[in-house]
Amino acid sequence: ASNSYPTMKLIAKRYELKTAGSSGQQHRVILIPGSSGKHYSQIMNGAPFDVFFSADIERARLLEQEGRILAGTRFTYALGRLILWSSIDNYVDSKGDVLNKKDFRYLAIANPKLAPYGKSAEEALRSLGLWTNLKERLVRGENIAQTFQFISSGNAKLGFVAYSQIMNPGISIDGSFWEVPQSVYEPIEQQAVLLQDSDIGREFLSFVKSDESLSIIYESGYGLP
């Protein structure tokens, strides 16, 4: 999932260092970011991934139902948090009332058909009674990373992204944001699965569940399962 890419880079680096120290043979983790929907399609078409980190339950569950994962390996690794963000300081208020203004041309969301955070953004807008008024102003990113770029570049004045994206360790993110109440969208349970019968894959997933990794996940702006 694109939203968890920076977090997974930190976890993968920590894992690689740990394996080098314990066994003398460092395991290398190759991360391939993209929308959960796109990766799901690639896996169904035979992409040789070992592990899949989705931004939702749905794709992980579908892969399980299709017999594409190792039995008993599906688990929740993080709870996503949706925010409305603008790269402009003091533009987004603490209640999200900016959505009722008419001074922005575009509102960015990830494609709801491909990206779980886009689906959550649509759910939130519908729950808040704003979908009808704002749907013509929506610009859709293929994934949450592209959606973030739309906003950070100024092509969209504001949009819905993952809280983890502005909590990216080592990078100072300017702007203003409102954390969307979790009562207006379905919980974003991000799940992982093991796709290949691999000892290293099992070991890496076990490391993701460790207190060391959970601390990284929490500090990156996620809730813990």
Feature names for model-found ranges:
Residues A1-P33, G37-A47, S54-I57, R61-G67, ...:
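Exported/periplasmic ABC-transporter solute-binding proteins
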